[in-house]
Amino acid sequence: TNHHVIENADKISVTLSGGSEYEAEIVGSDITSDLALLKLDGSDFPYAQLGSSEDLLIGEWVIALGNPFQLFSISNKPSASVGIISATNMDFGRLKSGKVFQDMIQTDSAINHGNSGGPLVNALGEVIGINTFIYTGSDQAQGSVGIGFAIPINSAKRVAKELRTTGHVDRGYSTGLVVQSVTQSISRYLNIPFSKGVIIVEVTDGSAAEGSGLEPGDVILTVNREPVNKPSDIRSVIIDNDLRSGDKVTLKIFRDGNYK
């Protein structure tokens, strides 16, 4: 489910189709990805198959399931709405709340308050996303206007694996680099034909940076196509894209008069 669904809850209960209610335990929760992993005591629960969000097609049919406006309590069944995938890879970056929404699935399936944390499934009934938020067009509007967003299931699987293992998501990292801004004085001294980017001062032995072939004197211009002009810019790219240890990044560098 979503982190914002269970945030600040004193007690969490899960009601299955048919009305059976169970108390849930929080295995782990992560505000950055807005995901939480819950556990029910028992066995032989019905469950949905998790699909893949790797090769989704715009125009593909999808179904959003959930509990909009607490309607589940009337019939003890989830509500369903049908639509298509309107867009993929929708990036919102880091919000003021601290959440980072990357590669979101946009759908015109009706998603309303109460749908958060519910599944977005494909025509085969496989879960391809976690319904998370809607765009209403104004602060006063409350209902769906056909623009909803879901966290891709592949991203959710990755977070859930960490939550199951440790109860949290580890975002500690080390680049193995010491850098400084390329100022006009540095560019003149080193004969660099510009005064932008950051220059590598030191590369830690055995680090991923060393393994990738980076060297002192290289000038990093972009990280994942985003300009970097001061040391903190590298950290900002990592945080804004929710990158973690083991993730790969693409750099544009200047070395010995050539761009690489």
Locate predicted features.
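Short, acidic, Ser/Thr-enriched surface-loop or helix-capping motifs
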Residues: L16, E21, A80, N122, ...
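Conserved active-site neighborhood of the chymotrypsin/trypsin-like protease fold
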Residues: T1-F72, K157, T222, V228-N229, ...
